Regions:
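Membrane-proximal, proline-rich intrinsically disordered regions
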Residues: 4-56
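Short linear capping/connector segments at secondary-structure termini
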Residues: 14-18, 84, 152-159
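Short, conserved catalytic or interaction motifs in soluble domains
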Residues: 6, 147-150
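Conserved, well-structured interaction surfaces
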Residues: 30, 34, 38-46, 69-145, ...
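Core domains of carbohydrate- and sulfate-ester-processing enzymes
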Residues: 57-72
Length: 180
């Protein structure tokens, strides 16, 4: 006989949400959507702070024909505008990760919001908003990197190395998604 029963150990922490304890109420849906917007506050996405270390709007603009400036070589934007940046520059991975963080959160909402017992109209509204935010992130990614992994659902560990999808196919999918 065993000293412990099968239910002795809790697998879900009572102190934080999990896939089995979340997605119960409309408040959960609202918090999940808020988390999507919250991730968009990353200084690596839309930061207009001219501190020279981020690749927000300012950094992206320096990679266009408007990017000529004389800020000095210490600023991240200077290497981009002078075409001396390397693919290993940290700004690119930070920008990539920030976009995919928003995408991950949006995909979680789209995949799980239907588990919540609420009106279908509200479910569709939450999904549509998350899909629109996800589309914005893919516009960011494809404008900088062109072909990128196109993820429309949460990834499992075995799917973590997703292949790239052609930019044209991503844009077509986004346009179709936004017809909802």
């Amino acid at each position: 006989a065993s000293a412990c029963s099968d239910s002795f150990l809790q697998t879900d922490s009572p102190n934080q949400p999990s896939q089995t304890t979340y997605w119960q109420t409309e408040s959960d849906a609202l918090m999940a959507l808020t988390a999507c917007y919250d991730a968009m506050q990353s200084q690596n996405l839309y930061d207009d702070n001219i501190d020279g270390w981020k690749f927000g709007f300012l950094g992206r603009e320096t990679s266009t024909d408007n990017g000529d400036h004389t800020w000095g070589n210490w600023m991240l934007g200077s290497s981009i505008s002078q075409c001396t940046s390397a693919t290993t520059d940290e700004c690119f991975s930070m920008y990539w990760n920030a976009n995919y963080e928003v995408i991950k959160r949006c995909n979680m909402l789209v995949e799980n919001v239907e588990r919540i017992p609420m009106e279908q109209e509200k479910i569709e509204a939450y999904k549509a908003e998350a899909i629109a935010l996800r589309a914005l992130m893919y516009c960011n990614l494809t404008s900088v990197f062109r072909d990128v992994p196109y993820l429309t659902k949460p990834l499992t560990l075995s799917e973590a190395q997703a292949p790239k999808t052609e930019r044209s196919q991503i844009i077509s999918s986004l346009l179709e998604d936004l017809k909802i």
